Amino acid sequence: MTSTNDIRRSFLDYFGGAGHHIEPSAPLVPYNDPTLMFVNAGMVPFKNVFTGLEKRPYSTAASSQKCVRAGGKHNDLDNVGYTARHHTFFEMLGNFSFGDYFKEQAIHHAWTLITQTWGLAPEKLTATVYHTDDEAFDLWKKIAGLPDERIIRIPTSDNFWSMGDTGPCGPCSEIFYDHGDHVRGGPPGSPEEDGDRFVEIWNLVFMQYEQLPGGERVDLPRPSIDTGMGLERVAAVLQGVHDNYDTDTFKALIEASVELTGVRADEAHRASHRVIADHLRASSFLVADGVLPSNEGRGYVLRRIMRRAMRHAHLLGAKDPLMHRLLPSLTAEMGAAYPELIRAQPLIAETLEREEVKFRQTLDKGLRLLDEATADMGRGDTLVGDVAFKLYDTYGFPYDLTEDALRSKGISVDRAGFDAAMAQQKAAARAAWKGSGQKASEEIWFDLAETHGSTEFTGYTSTSGEATVIALVRDGQPVEEARAGDEVIVLTNQTPFYGESGGQMGDAGMIATLEGAKASVSDTGKPLGRLHTHQAKLEAGTLKVGDTVQLTVDAERRDRIRANHSATHLLHAALRNRLGGHVTQKGSLVAADRFRFDFSHPKALTAAEIADIEADVNAQIRGNEPVTTRLMTPDDAIAAGALALFGEKYGDEVRVLAMGKADDRNYSVELCGGTHVRALGDIALFKIVSESAVSSGVRRIEALTGEAARQWLNGRDEALKAAAAALKTSPDEVPARVAQLAEQLKKAERELADAKKALALGGSGGDGGAAAGPAVEQVGDVAFLAQVVDGLDPKELRGTVDGLKKQVGSGVAMLVAVNDGRASVAVGVTDDKTGHHSAVDLVKAAVVALGGQGGGGRPDMAQGGGPNGGAANDAVAAVKAALA
């Protein structure tokens, strides 16, 4: 049997031997593409190459690309586990030609690989072509020798591909494998095509046209090839099975699930084991690529996938978290091909376990609610959207999990009602994924880059220099000149100004000409990653395209940014050393006055951890080692141990920053295009000022360096001295004195609370005299005792009412506590009276009088409150009225 790993390797070896560049899989989160939530096809990383916005140093390529289809237009989540070929995570094998070879060679490569390298019988193969693509029809006859009846013309859009309403497009040709007439189904294009007999294994897209806005198609000057083949599908064919879940990778994962749950993958439980196997792959790869579970965007899709698998683990009777215990089986199957799985294994395991523990806390309650809501329903009925939304909002059930849970009962869910409830609760504040990246409308940058090429950056070695103005942009349009008072974007052929990227803010400074033009630069951008755009305001003179200018960076501001940026590298290394290799940078902001650093870690840092990390960084600063820079290829840099940041896109040559010493190695080695100090002593001082949560599994540190850190510490010192003076003690004694005062205050508050409680119960006052307690009165057929007290802690209400109940003996006791204008109320009913009067009903009457809503508890004791403390006596009257 040919393993899935062997198939992947042989595909890449074949095309590598045919002169193709072998492109590693891109992360699942698309780089700078606001139109996609996840990479969902092999061509996605090459999209800008196909559209001409990006140039690569090769014209042919092949890859095995990780893909996820579980959100947006391409969403296979609902079908996973119940069909033979649907997955949330899959691998797409593909070969690509960017204006190099076209149809004939694409068909030749496909036929040679599947029939000669993989040995599929030609008589088992059928091809489809777009109904007007005579060229492809003839090529299949010529190259493969297929008879006319096994080259099927398809007139539908299934065999015509387009990137969108406009842009590259072209006909497709698909290759199908025939499992034989013992399997149900007919050939493509027939009424029985949805059966399992004929399985599509490869799609060849011939990009030969450009779709224009008016609907016209014109020939592309350099037609291209985009092919895609699902690895799981072709593995099933080559391994002689009809079901992707019977292939070696899935069999290993399902066997592990069976072993850990003790439940066989029989007809009743097969879907659950398949869901778990598929969703384990998707969840693990998403976490490895930097996505963590949350309640919005990509993180919410991940949470939906995880929780769907976790419900199926619950169906299998798993008493303890299961998913993280299956992870070793996944890394054994796929870790060699995707080493990021092994690198991120601790983080993946912790994330899976934490999410499953969290979900299990509400899963049983939610399922009970679902059972109650559907107890009287039958097949064909619909669960109302309000209940589905309550399951989502209260118990963490994504909508599709509720759908999945009701699938076996044949009950559907009211999607419109669910959406209406969601909209009503969250309204405009609902967090919808909006993507990120360059605005598609900013075509001007593409035009300028094509005309002038990339801006040469000279700022690594200098903060000033001469340049030529190559473009001026005002209000989004190119202009030839700018005058005093104009706000304009200035582009030059070269610049020492750093353009904002990699979390580092852009430089500020001045632009001047010998003729007297003078412009202040407030910021520098870097659109497309190639241009440097100076955001400037002309203060004097006239600036024209073609002028020679002197560019001067604000050096003092740049130095502070350098220090903060180098400190982020030291902090990153310290975090990984202290907390573990699962720590990865999730984002940063490097400004002149401060910096923040976001990183993956499942819990808050302790005070001791923060102190240790701070000490580690400052020790490196005191060591004052020089910062070294080398230019390397990305592969060489990573092989040498450099950290590459998730989501960053690197060119053919990268800067590798090494700084500090740890035993016989550098303390930190990272790929980075930013500006840095020359020696670590230039940072001077490092101080963490806050540590907080950004989202589930992501923490944020905010820190200061140099003079900003010194001023912050001085401010704390002054505050400490002021506190010491107010406390009439020395600064060293402030903590002990504050603790002493806090204990005294706590004691005084306890004594005051006891006094108020005693007063409410009619106990003795502070002067030793007897205080008149509340009088018991007869209301209707029940004894009733009520008291209104100012300042009694609401937490004391129930205990105090228990005391009042004893005074009543048999009847109802009520206490209203007024604090800061609000009122809290508790009502107690003695056991012999709960059959006639419920404390819950009585307290609800009181709460309405106080301007509140709700209130609850038990028949013998209930509590509530309202905003109108002035209506305390009205609340007493309301309870009396309810008793009368």
From Swiss-Prot:
Pfam families, per database record: DHHA1, tRNA-synt_2c, tRNA_SAD
Main location: cytoplasm
Binding, Zn(2+): H565, H569, C672, H676
Transmembrane residue ranges: none
Domain of life: Bacteria
A single MF term (Gene Ontology): zinc ion binding
One annotated GO biological process: alanyl-tRNA aminoacylation
Enzyme class: ligase
One GO cellular component term: cytosol
Record keyword RNA-binding present: yes
Recorded domain comment: Consists of three domains; the N-terminal catalytic domain, the editing domain and the C-terminal C-Ala domain. The editing domain removes incorrectly charged amino acids, while the C-Ala domain, along with tRNA(Ala), serves as a bridge to cooperatively bring together the editing and aminoacylation centers thus stimulating deacylation of misacylated tRNAs.
Family that this chain belongs to: Belongs to the class-II aminoacyl-tRNA synthetase family.
Protein name: Alanine--tRNA ligase
Organism from which the protein derives: Sphingopyxis alaskensis (strain DSM 13593 / LMG 18877 / RB2256)
Name of the gene this protein is made from: alaS
